[in-house]
From Swiss-Prot:
<keyword id="KW-0551">Lipid droplet</keyword>
<feature type="modified residue" description="Phosphoserine">
    <location>
        <position position="1296"/>
    </location>
</feature>
<feature type="modified residue" description="Phosphoserine">
    <location>
        <position position="349"/>
    </location>
</feature>
<dbReference type="GO" id="GO:0005811">
    <property type="term" value="C:lipid droplet"/>
</dbReference>
<protein>
    <recommendedName>
        <fullName>Golgi-specific brefeldin A-resistance guanine nucleotide exchange factor 1</fullName>
    </recommendedName>
</protein>
<dbReference type="GO" id="GO:0016192">
    <property type="term" value="P:vesicle-mediated transport"/>
</dbReference>
<dbReference type="GO" id="GO:0008289">
    <property type="term" value="F:lipid binding"/>
</dbReference>
<feature type="region of interest" description="Disordered">
    <location>
        <begin position="1430"/>
        <end position="1484"/>
    </location>
</feature>
<keyword id="KW-0597">Phosphoprotein</keyword>
<dbReference type="InterPro" id="IPR035999">
    <property type="entry name" value="Sec7_dom_sf"/>
</dbReference>
<feature type="region of interest" description="Disordered">
    <location>
        <begin position="1284"/>
        <end position="1333"/>
    </location>
</feature>
<comment type="subunit">
    <text>Can form homodimers and probably homotetramers. Interacts with COPG1; the interaction is independent on ARF1 activation. Interacts with ARF1, ARF3, ARF4 and ARF5. Interacts with RAB1B (GTP-bound form); required for GBF1 membrane association. Interacts with GGA1, GGA2 and GGA3. Interacts with USO1. Interacts (via SEC7 domain) with PNPLA2 (via C-terminus); the interaction is direct. Can form homodimers and probably homotetramers. Interacts with COPG1; the interaction is independent on ARF1 activation. Interacts with ARF1, ARF3, ARF4 and ARF5.</text>
</comment>
<feature type="compositionally biased region" description="Polar residues">
    <location>
        <begin position="1295"/>
        <end position="1308"/>
    </location>
</feature>
<dbReference type="Pfam" id="PF01369">
    <property type="entry name" value="Sec7"/>
</dbReference>
<feature type="region of interest" description="HUS (homology upstream of Sec7); DCB:HUS domain interaction">
    <location>
        <begin position="528"/>
        <end position="548"/>
    </location>
</feature>
<feature type="modified residue" description="Phosphoserine">
    <location>
        <position position="1781"/>
    </location>
</feature>
<feature type="region of interest" description="Phosphatidylinositol-phosphate binding; required for translocation to the leading edge and for ARF1 activation upon GPCR signaling">
    <location>
        <begin position="884"/>
        <end position="1370"/>
    </location>
</feature>
Length: 1856
């Protein structure tokens, strides 16, 4: 079966042959013989061949292509026929009729390329001709892009590309055709560079010899004499020409296309020849492999180029004055004669595309190409077999053609080449963009050389042009360069960034705004490259001799983000974008670290050394780039593939390894180079500390450089002082510094090294140059560019002499002697001046080569120098000036600067470090956060666009996240402070705040951000807390906070909560409540509110504001404070504490609100409260103790202290300190304390109910009971504390009130784990502070007065708070405790009694530590409740309106404002004022019921304790023995019980027996009777019973003699009668032990005295009848017991007691003896204990000497011992004067009997009445009694007391 492809070819043959035959030329002749026409003959032959085969593959591609190619080459064919042949060829390629694997394919492709690029046809009209050109483009594109195109040679590809360029740049062609050519070029360039990774680098020698063949013409067609494309074999004209040239010329339309295209205008206007040559030379010069050539100027033309030019035979090449690619040739214009000659020669038949001019104007080129040996037969058929036979087989194209194309594209971008039009430059930039996007160009060293030099230079020059399209395209190419290969372009990148900064900052009005915008866009784009910013910092800011690019750019961008006019433009936002890029990348890295902590830890375990890590990262980065480029390539090629079966990218992919794989391989090779580290670093990734050192050193170097540039010695000296240069000066070191530092003034270097004092330094300086292999002029050029040559001849001589010596030693002394060398060097300098100095050129004709040779004749040791060397030197100097630094300007200077840049890039200084993403983020952030936050703040403030505002907020949040990640508190504080300004909360007045805030969306965003950041990153917040708290305070003032934040706990309020936002009281102006309410609603002044109510807009704004604050959730700051780091927590507390009283800004409610927040925070942090306790405690101390008057804040402080105690007592580690802190309340002024008694009483009750089990220490119990006493009964706090509080008033608050009780022998202070910061107290307005320390001295001098260790350890727990010394005198024989009770509140007393009841009734809460305290407190409460507390109420005067709940939460309005609080606490002294109308509001109707309940409760409690005391003490003693615990030994004997329990309790009960209220009095008497007759008291001995009489019964009887209840006379009579009966009963019941007392007579006489008093006390007969009967009973019992009989009396005479008794009785019952004993005669007395009268009379009248426990008693009132007025005078006198009389009219002293500390308590027991032989039962009275409200001060009734027994316990303290 015949191959279908054969039919396709046959069809195409028929079409073309038919067209040839139909041509007008054939119409006038008979059909020609095909044998005579070569074209038809070829087709005929092909037909025969095709008919003889069945498969197309059986014949070579050349066979079926040749006829078509001959048609294309034929000069005689018309355009349409040529077009048909081109269409056929294109079809063959598109249909893949050519087998890529066929061995003849290469030859066929080469012939096809040659034919199409040299297509010739007879032109008709321009439109038809352009159709043919379009088809040529199409064939060339298809040829290169299909798989068979890979067989093309380097030369063919260059031909194809150049053909396309000619069409593209020919302005006479239509735009459509030129654009088609442009698109074709794009596809071709993309294909070629996509295939770049497949090609291998060729040996340099191969590159050097082959490049000459492949140079595409860089100039226009007129420059044929300069750039000659290599000629192919001659092409003779066709043999069978029908028409002579002459006949064709006259034809009007006979001009061929060539004539049309070349009439006086060149096809291509491209860069000049020297430009191309020098660009190629430079690429070789800067190649990293040629170190020796690095020091050559990049503008020198290499020998290779010069040779090439000579071979090209161009006379102009040696006469051009170009000194570099930027200079223009002297003669670039085409010779007119040459132009006309060309036109004539080519008029008949010309090539349509490639080489119109070269063949006519240039001699044959001798540099052979692959095709130079081809033979072309007369028909134009080329035969290449001969060359293959000779061993020159066709080589597929590779790197050489790509390099040549790349060089050509770069040459197109030279803005200084006048041949390069704007369109050409743009085209070059566009194709370079495609090339860089398609391939990893940096891996190709041959291309890299071109990039480093010419390409970068042209691009930077283009940044200065005013054409925006070129400027933009240049920026695009620059981005691609520095994105992918910045590691090779360190100093180029530095120059680029500097140029961009210059463009942004320049104030030139001609500079378009768009250029600045694009420059900023370019920076933003670069900054978004991962790690780019970090690399800027590492490679430039941390390089001694580079600019601080990152720092400078950051400053520039920050400054540029602030609009001068106030209006935001794109440039401002772009600057912000750039700054945010750093923030974004850093934040992303931080997020990744946070999210992948575990993964990173695993990586660390298996991590490699740092340099390997860097390499791998770079490799990964490169691979990533390759992948990205690959994707871009694919996408682009998809778009460009058009209808072809096989697009360019498919062709590139065909038969090659994956691009990524190749690139990775290349990168892995390049990585070896990356491991080189810059000399300034100790390792590849230096740590931040090292970078800081480098930066510091860099600053010093810059300063030293500046000083050197002014005075070299001064600069060197400065660097030596700073340790950067050694002392003494090291010449080698200084020379190296002079060479390395580009900032040094070249003139100063010249002067310094040429100084005759520095000869050694000059030698060292010269030795830093490497002159090996360099010609003298080249070495001199290098030498003289390093410094400015001074003008003095001796100095020049010295410098040149050193140079020539070094050059000779480096090059083996090539000249005769050093003088010859010196002369030549001098001659070169003179030549340079002669050729390039403008002044010299004006006066003289420049020296010629011959003159130069003549000048040096015979100088080389009498001989001549080699003429070739002199010629080379002459041309080198003539063509390129030796630039004297800082002498030239303009282009010459630019060339010099560029050569220096290239030179630096080739040294180790040019190493560019690539770093992994995330490295040095902290360093970068530290440098950028300030400018960034400032810019963000400005943009946020000025912008109204939502997107920009959100961008700014996002930036704020990211900055916050980074600062939190790295723990940068100062950054976060700055950010919060900045944001707080935008919340509008601090600037607005309170009246307008809800409206203004509610209607400001930007303020909402700022507020939400502030609170969100505080919630999320509060850990690192420090100073910012203050701003946040100020904002919250503003919200509080404006009543915008949630209800939960303004409601606080309260002990007294029935709901348990009150609001901190109190109602306003009506002002003095008489404003009505309605107006006040309206004013409050509108949040405006009374003037406005009285006119109109709140507007709808204001209401809506307030609603929006409330919603916003709800979303902010400020309460979360409190609830989540438990998660804050300790330091942040302390700062938060410090911010809250700082809102305290000062002159200006103080507001009581603000302070109360802050206090409540502080307390809530402390409670939230109770797990670590020890760390912050001192702060809060000292703050509470300040608020409470310093308060001079009561105010709301003081009340909240007191409540807060109690709340803390209630919550924190459960925590063992802090409970002691908390309880000690309650003593703050005792330090308050009594007047202030009494005003908060309600709160304290209720708070203490709550505390004891919830935490009694957690109180263990006696000191703690002492604190609580003292508080109960002060609050419940108005007892003044212990004097020691009050004295201390007064003394510390100017300097309170900084003391530790916990030191006293913790001052033990081995435990000086409590460890709080946290030392209070002095700043906590700086706002308190006190001058000096004494801060805590652990020293004893500090303890003693602290707020709690430590009197002495012994005082603390030995004092009674009841005293509790270190009694003052000396102690005031206390009467032990009074029923009261002897304290001065101040005013107290009955409700408070009732609550305190409840608290006491709770303790007493629960056996678990009564402990040895608190028993005595409890008893003492009971007695104090008894005294306070006497007569219903009338004494206290009288003292209080009018009750405070504070006690009224109605006024408790009202506040006085500030004048002129309804909303504002008064600013000073004095305006707020109370929650309300005094009011007569409401005087009794604090004493409700049930007051008397309440007071009665209090007294009854106290009675019950005392009786309970009394009955339980014995069992309680027994159990404690047993427990102590069982546990063998240490501490104070607990005794359960009767003496202890009496002294500590029974006696004080009986005194308390007896005290209530003196109550003015009859019910209380009678009930108390009943309790007293039960108590005295209880079974446990039978254990008491005689002394204790005597004490009972002296301390309980006698004071009771004394008190009852007073007129307690004047209104209830009968009741008082009954009371007195019951009391006297009780006295008699107790006396008789315990008569037996009492008789053993040595003081019995005194006791008995005292009883008689009371009988006397009582008998005359009442007005009724009740007592006058009852007393004698009681007395008779006692006398009879005593007489029966023979007490009145003297033991030693003779004859049974009566004893002295008998005499004394009747002396006393006779005073008031003179007839009783007769009545009782008239029939009785006293018998001999029974034996009794000897009681002598002397003993009675003398021993016990005075206290025992030296007994410290006995204190003198108060005076005895005279009426106690006096008889009634009717008594005989003599009797009275006897009584008074008798030494044994128990009573005396004159005052006398007595000593108390021994007693221990006060009593305690225990559960109730069943009363068991006793039966005693001496007991006489007296029925109890039950008569109603009316009480007298007076209180009588008790006095001791008896002056006679016994001395204590030796075994009695010595009292340790008094009951106070």
């Amino acid at each position: 079966m015949v191959d279908k492809n054969i039919y396709i070819i046959q069809g195409e043959i028929n079409i073309v042959v038919g067209a040839i035959k139909r041509n007008a030329r054939w119409s006038t002749h008979i059909p020609l013989d095909e044998e005579r026409d070569p074209l038809l003959h070829s087709f005929s032959h092909l037909k025969e061949v095709l008919n003889s085969v069945t498969e197309l593959s059986e014949i070579e591609p050349n066979v079926f292509l040749r006829p078509f190619l001959e048609v294309i080459r034929s000069e005689d064919t018309t355009g349409p026929i040529t077009g048909l042949a081109l269409t056929s060829v294109n079809k063959f390629l598109s249909y893949a009729l050519i087998d890529p694997t066929h061995e003849g394919t290469a030859e066929g492709m080469e012939n096809m390329a040659d034919a199409v690029t040299h297509a010739r046809f007879v032109g008709t009209d321009p439109a038809s001709d352009e159709v043919v050109l379009m088809k040529i483009l199409q064939v060339l594109r298809t040829l290169l892009l299909t798989p068979v195109g890979t067989h093309l040679t380097n030369e063919s590809v260059c031909e194809i590309m150049q053909s396309c360029f000619r069409i593209c740049f020919e302005m006479r062609l239509s735009e459509l055709l030129r654009k088609s050519a442009e698109h074709t070029l794009v596809d071709m360039v993309q294909l070629l560079f996509t295939r770049l990774p497949q090609f291998k680098e060729e040996p340099k020698s191969y590159v050097g010899t082959n490049m000459k063949k492949l140079k595409m013409r860089a100039g226009g067609m007129s420059d044929s004499s300069k750039w000659k494309k290599q000629k192919r074999s001659p092409r003779p004209p066709r043999h069978m020409t029908r028409v002579t040239p002459g006949s064709e010329l006259p034809a009007p339309n006979g001009a061929t296309l060539s004539c049309n295209l070349t009439s006086g205008m060149p096809f291509i206007d491209v860069p000049s020849s020297i430009s191309s040559a020098s660009s190629e030379a430079a690429s070789a010069v800067v190649s990293p492999c040629t170190d020796s050539g690095l020091e050559l100027s990049s503008q020198t033309t290499s020998k290779e180029d010069l040779t090439d030019l000579e071979q090209a035979g161009s006379p102009r090449e040696s006469t051009t004055t170009e000194s570099g690619s930027n200079e223009i040739g002297v003669s670039d214009q085409l010779d007119p004669q040459e132009g006309s000659h060309v036109e004539k020669a080519q008029s008949a038949s010309v090539e349509s595309i490639p080489e119109v001019l070269e063949e006519c104007t240039s001699p044959p080129d001798h540099s052979a190409s692959v095709h130079d040996m081809d033979y072309v037969n007369p028909r134009g058929v080329r035969f290449t077999q001969s060359s293959q036979k000779e061993g020159t087989a066709l080589v597929p194209y590779g790197l050489p053609c790509i390099r040549e194309l790349f060089r050509f594209l770069i040459s197109l971008t030279n803005p200084h080449d006048r041949h390069n039009s704007e369109g050409m430059i743009h085209m070059g930039l566009h194709l370079l963009t495609v090339a860089l996007e398609s391939a990893p160009v940096a891996q190709c060293q041959t291309l890299l050389g071109l990039i480093k030099d010419e390409m970068c230079r042209h691009l930077f020059q283009l940044l200065s042009v005013e054409r925006l399209n070129l400027y933009a395209a240049s920026l695009r190419v620059c981005f691609l360069l520095f994105e992918s290969m910045r590691e090779h372009l360190k100093f180029q990148l530095e120059m680029y960034m500097k140029k961009l900064m210059e463009i942004i900052t320049v104030e030139n009005p001609k500079m378009p705004y768009e250029m600045k915008e694009m420059a900023l866009e370019a920076i933003v784009q670069l900054w978004r490259i991962p790690s780019f910013v970090t690399e800027l910092y590492i490679n430039y800011d941390c390089d001694y001799y580079c600019a601080n690019l990152f720092e400078d750019l950051t400053k520039l961008l920050s400054k540029n983000a602030f609009p001068v006019s106030g209006q935001l433009y794109t440039t401002h936002l772009l600057s912000l974008d750039a700054l945010l890029t750093v923030i974004d990348s850093t934040e992303a890295h931080c997020q990744a670290k946070v999210l992948n902590t575990l993964t990173q830890q695993e990586k660390k375990e298996t991590s490699r050394p740092s340099y390997e890590a860097v390499d791998s990262t770079q490799e990964a980065n490169s691979t990533e780039r390759a992948t990205i480029d690959g994707k871009a390539t694919g996408m682009a090629s998809d778009a460009l593939g058009l209808h072809l079966q096989s697009g360019g990218w498919l062709s590139a992919e065909h038969g090659k390894p994956r691009c990524n794989d190749v690139e990775e391989a290349g990168d892995s090779g390049a990585d070896k180079k990356f491991t080189r580290k810059p000399p300034r670093f100790s390792c590849l990734l230096p740590d931040p500390r090292e970078l800081i050192e480098i930066k510091n050193k860099k600053k010093l170097l810059i300063t030293g450089t500046e000083q050197f540039n002014q005075k070299p010695k001064k600069g060197i000296q400065f660097l030596q002082e700073k340790g950067l240069l050694t002392i003494p000066m090291d010449n080698t070191e200084v020379a190296q510094w002079l060479r390395e530092n580009p900032r040094l003034d070249k003139k100063m270097i010249g002067e310094f090294v040429s100084d005759r004092k520095n000869i050694d330094l000059l030698e060292s300086f010269v030795s830093t140059f490497s002159f090996q292999g360099l010609r003298l002029d080249e070495a001199l050029r290098l030498y003289l560019e390093a410094f400015r040559l001074p003008g003095e001849a001796p100095v020049i001589h010295r410098l040149l002499e050193a140079f020539t010596e070094h050059w000779r030693s480096c090059n083996g002394s090539p000249f005769a002697n050093s003088d010859a060398c010196f002369a030549l060097a001098y001659a070169v300098i003179m030549l340079n001046t002669d050729q390039h100095n403008h002044n010299v050129r004006k006066q003289n004709v420049p020296m010629t080569l011959e003159e130069f040779r003549k000048n040096l004749k015979g100088v080389n040791g009498g001989k001549d120098f080699e003429q070739d060397i002199l010629e080379d030197m002459y041309h080198a100097i003539k063509n390129e000036e030796i630039v004297m630094p800082e002498e030239q300007t303009g282009l010459v200077r630019e060339n010099y600067v560029w050569s220096v840049l290239l030179h630096r890039g080739a040294t180790p200084e040019g190493i560019f470090l690539r770093v992994p993403p995330g490295s040095y983020d902290l360093d970068l952030f530290t440098m950028t956060w300030g400018p960034t936050i400032a810019a963000l703040s400005y943009v946020f403030d000025k912008s109204i666009e939502e997107t920009i505002i959100q961008k700014a907020i996002s930036g704020f949040r990211k900055c916050a996240m980074i600062s939190a990640h790295y723990g940068l508190s100062d950054v976060f504080d700055n950010l919060i402070i900045s944001l707080c300004k935008f919340t509008a909360l601090s600037s607005e007045s309170i009246e307008n705040l809800p409206t203004v805030f509610g209607s400001n969306p930007k303020a909402h965003i700022a507020a939400k951000t502030v609170f969100h950041l505080a919630h999320r990153h509060g850990d690192i917040l420090r100073e910012g807390w203050k701003n946040i708290m100020e904002a919250v305070l503003q919200l509080f003032r404006a009543q915008l906070l949630p209800q939960a934040m303004v409601e606080v706990e309260d002990f007294v309020d029935p709901n348990g909560k009150i609001s901190l936002q109190r109602e306003e009281m009506p002002s003095n102006r008489g404003e009505s409540s309605v107006l006040s309410f309206v004013s409050w609603l509108t949040l405006s002044g009374p003037e406005q509110s009285s006119v109109r109510g709140p507007s709808t807009e204001n209401q809506e704004a307030k609603r929006v504001a409330l919603d916003c604050i709800k979303q902010c959730d400020p309460e979360k700051m409190i609830t989540e404070s438990k998660f804050l780091q300790l330091e942040s927590l302390q700062e938060l507390m410090k911010a809250l504490v700082s809102v305290t009283a000062d002159e200006e800004t103080y507001d009581e409610e603000d302070a109360a609100f802050c206090l409540e927040m502080l307390l809530r925070i402390v409670l939230e942090n109770r797990d670590r409260v020890g760390c912050v306790w001192q702060t809060v405690r000292d703050h509470l101390y300040h608020l409470c103790v310093q308060a001079q008057d009561f105010c709301f804040l003081v009340e909240r402080a007191v409540v807060g202290l109690l709340r803390l105690a209630i919550r924190l007592l459960r925590r063992e580690e802090i409970s002691g300190q908390v309880l000690l802190s309650l003593r703050i309340l005792l330090l308050m002024k009594p007047s202030v304390l009494s005003r908060v008694s309600h709160q304290v009483a209720y708070g203490l009750h709550e505390l004891l109910k919830t935490n009694a089990a957690n109180i263990h220490s006696g000191d703690d119990w002492a604190t609580l009971f003292t508080l109960l006493e002060c609050i419940g009964s108005g007892v003044k706090p212990p004097d020691a504390l009050q004295a201390t509080a007064r003394a510390d008033a100017p300097d309170a608050g900084a003391q530790s009130d916990s030191e006293l009780p913790s001052y033990h022998q081995n435990d000086v202070s409590l460890d709080r784990g946290y030392t209070s910061d002095s700043e906590v107290y700086t706002d308190h307005g006190r001058p000096g502070k004494i801060h805590r320390s652990a020293t004893d001295a500090d303890m003693v001098n602290s707020g709690w007065l430590v009197v002495g260790k012994d005082d603390i350890d030995n004092s009674k727990a009841g005293a509790g708070l270190s009694r003052p010394s000396p102690s005031p005198l206390v009467n032990q024989y009074s029923l009261t405790v002897g304290l001065d009770l101040g005013p107290h509140d009955t409700k408070s007393l009732l609550k305190c009694v409840e608290s006491l009841s709770f303790i007493v009734r629960d056996a678990a809460h009564i402990t040895p530590d608190n028993f005595e305290l409890c008893v003492k407190t009971l007695r104090i409460f008894v005294e306070a409740s006497l007569n219903g507390g009338c004494k206290s109420q009288d003292k209080r005067g009018k009750s405070h309106k504070y006690d009224s709940k109605g006024n408790r939460f009202k506040k006085k309005p500030k004048e002129g404002s309804v909303l504002r609080r008064p600013r000073t606490s004095s305006q707020h002294g109370t929650r309300g004022g005094h009011s007569d109308e409401e005087e009794d509001e604090g004493v409700p109707a049930s007051y008397h019921t309440v007071s009665l309940q209090v007294s009854q409760d106290l009675l019950d409690l005392m009786h309970t304790l009394h009955t339980r005391a014995a069992s309680i003490y027994s159990s404690w003693a047993e427990e102590q023995r069982h546990l063998e615990s240490g501490g104070r030994k607990i005794e359960a004997d009767s003496r202890t019980l009496w002294a500590h329990c029974w006696c004080p309790l009986l005194q308390g009960i007896a005290c209530l027996c003196c109550d003015a209220r009859r019910q209380v009095r009678m009930q108390a008497l009943t309790y007293l009777q039960r108590a005295l007759l209880v079974h446990d008291l039978q254990k008491l001995d005689a002394l204790e019973w005597e004490s009972c009489f002296n301390k309980v019964l006698f004071p009771l009887l004394t008190k009852l003699l007073e007129n307690i209840s004047p209104a209830d006379v009968g009741g008082m009579e009954e009371t007195r009668m019951r009391a006297s009966t009780l006295l008699s009963k107790v006396f008789l019941q315990h008569l037996s032990p009492l008789l053993s007392l040595s003081t019995f007579a005194a006791l008995w006489l005292t009883i008689l005295d009371f009988m006397d008093k009582y008998m005359h006390a009442g007005s009724s007969d009740l007592l006058s009848e009852a007393i004698p009967e009681s007395l008779k009973n006692m006398l009879l019992v005593m007489d029966t017991a023979e007490i009145f009989h003297s033991a030693d009396a003779r004859g049974g005479s009566p004893s002295a007691l008998w005499e004394i008794t009747w002396e006393r009785i006779d005073c008031f019952l003179p007839h009783l003896r007769d009545e009782l004993f008239k029939q009785t005669v006293i018998q001999d007395p029974m034996p009794t204990e000897p009681h002598s009268q002397n003993a009675l009379a003398s021993t016990h009248l005075t206290p025992a000497a030296g007994d410290p426990g006995h204190l003198p008693s108060p005076e005895i009132p005279s009426e106690v011992g006096a008889c009634d007025s009717e008594k005989p005078e003599g009797t009275r006198a006897t009584s008074s004067s008798s030494p044994g009389s128990p009573v005396a009219s004159s005052p006398s002293r007595l000593s108390p009997s021994p007693e221990g500390p006060p009593p305690l308590a225990q559960p109730p027991l069943i009363l068991q009445p006793l039966t005693s032989p001496l007991q006489v039962g007296v029925p109890p009275m039950a008569l109603p009694i009316i009480l007298n409200p007076a209180l009588i001060e008790a006095t001791s009734p008896v002056p006679l007391l016994s001395t204590p027994r030796p075994t009695d316990p010595i009292p340790t303290s008094e009951v106070n």
